[in-house]
Amino acid sequence: MRRAVCPGSFDPITNGHLDIIGRASKLYDVVHVAVMINQSKKGLFTVDERIELIREVTADFGNVEVESFHGLLVDFCKQREIPAIVKGLRAVSDFDYELQMAQMNNGLSGVETLFVPTNPTYSFLSSSLVKEVATWGGDVSHLLPPTVHEALVKRLGER
């Protein structure tokens, strides 16, 4: 069985993330979406909320499993016998950092990294940018799955 992981903070998941996960789901039998737990960063959504949102928007893929992880991604991969990491690249600036991470991960555990060029429609897109624009009242509905957009609007309204 071919397995891969798509890691990230997904705070919140965007259409760009969803595009990469969807493309990975066509290449692998099982795609694990690993939601990073970072104690030093207070997310807009809790890890459990992010997991639930990702499960909702990836349900139609049929071969995506979503869970959280804390620590080294290579340990997550080793525990689940996942030989590959799938990462989307938006720009050359992403490549510099992701290449270093890929080489470190391979050196630590032998896990391979597959770089997938981001769909040009989403080449500028990040969760941080979406949150910033939405905070100032900008329309980001075209950048997020509808259920995620609803959750974002609700959360920002609670602030």
From Swiss-Prot:
Cysteine disulfide partners in this protein: none
Keyword Ion transport set for record: no
Keyword Oxidoreductase attached: no
Binding site for substrate: S9, K41, L73, K87
Subcellular location: Cytoplasm
GO annotation, cellular component aspect: cytoplasm
Gene Ontology terms for molecular function: ATP binding; pantetheine-phosphate adenylyltransferase activity
Biological processes, Gene Ontology terms: coenzyme A biosynthetic process
EC number: 2.7.7.3
Residues noted as binding ATP in the record, renumbered to the chain: S9, F10, H17, G88, L89, R90, E98, Y122, S123, F124, L125, S126, S127, S128
Main location: cytoplasm
Enzyme class: transferase
InterPro entries: Cyt_trans-like, PPAT, Rossmann-like_a/b/a_fold
Necessary cofactors: Mg(2+)
Family statement drawn from the similarity comment of this UniProt entry: Belongs to the bacterial CoaD family.
Assembly with partners or alone: Homohexamer.
Stated role: Reversibly transfers an adenylyl group from ATP to 4'-phosphopantetheine, yielding dephospho-CoA (dPCoA) and pyrophosphate.
Protein name in UniProt: Phosphopantetheine adenylyltransferase
Species in which this protein is naturally found: Streptomyces griseus subsp. griseus (strain JCM 4626 / CBS 651.72 / NBRC 13350 / KCC S-0626 / ISP 5235)
Organism taxonomic ancestry: Bacteria, Bacillati, Actinomycetota, Actinomycetes, Kitasatosporales
Gene for this chain: coaD
